[in-house]
C-alpha cells in the first residue's frame, strides 16, 4: 500500500524480562498513546500513515480493548494464541526478546492449553477471567463506551485508574475465581 507503513511497538511481552532486568521501560498505555500521537504528527508532516501495533502482555480482551482505545491499530497476542489446543507449540510460547542459552528464539514460557483457537478469539467462554472470547470482549467494551468502529474507539478518552484492577475483587480473590485467580 502506498502511503502506509507499519511499526511494531514492543512494550514488554509475556516472556520478556528486559524491564525487570534493566529497571527501565514505559507503561503500555503511555507508550501506545505516545506512538499514536507521533503517528499523527508523522502523517501531518509526510502524508504517510504509520500503523501502531501494540505488543506486550496482552492476556485478556480488556487488555486488547485498552490498547485499541489508547490508539493501537492492532495488537500482538502471542501467549493467548499459544494456549490454543491447535497451537504448534503445544502449550508453550517462545518470547522473541529474551535470550535463552538453548532456545534460538528467547525464553520458553508455559502458556498451557486452555481452549480451542475459536474459543479464545470468538467464544463461547467457559471461564470468566477475560482470557476467552477476546473479540467479544472488545465488542462489548466498545458498545459499553458508545463506540461503533475501531477508528472511533481509537480516539476514546482514556482515564488511568489503578483501582479498577482490585476494586470489588475481594470475593473473587477469596474464592479463586474470575479475575481474582
Where are the language model's segments positioned?
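Gly-rich Lys/Arg/Thr-decorated short loops/hinges at beta-loop-alpha junctions or inter-strand turns
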Residues: 10-20
